[in-house]
Amino acid sequence: MMYLNELLSIPTLQELTLINQNACLDRPVATIESTETPDVISYVPKNCFIITTAMAYKENQEKLCELILSLDKLPCAGLGIKLGRFIDELDPKVIQTADSVGFPLINIPIHLTLG
C-alpha cells in the first residue's frame, strides 16, 4: 500500500501542495476517488484520497468542515481540492478544522486535470 507522502512525491504529482500545516502525511492510500457529490461519505472506501473541485461547497464552505471531520473518521487519506475553479481560497475555518485532526488538504493547481 502507498502512503500519501509517497503519492505526493510522484514526479507527475509534485505540483500538488499541502494547504494546511498540521497534516498527517503518513496516511495509507488504497484508492483515488474523484467526486463532486456532497454525500460522498456514503460512497467512498476507507483509505481513499479524494479529488474534487468542491463545487458543492462554493456557497457554503462550513459544510466542508463537516465533510473533513467525517472523512477523517472513515478514515480517508486526504482531500485534494482544485482551487480556482469554484472556490478561489479556503475559509480559514476549513483549514483550522483540518489542522485540528491532522487531516491533509491538498491544493490541485488549476491547470492540472482531475482525470
Role assignments for model-derived ranges:
Residues M1-G115:
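Alpha-helical/coil-rich non-catalytic "connector" segments in signaling and regulatory proteins
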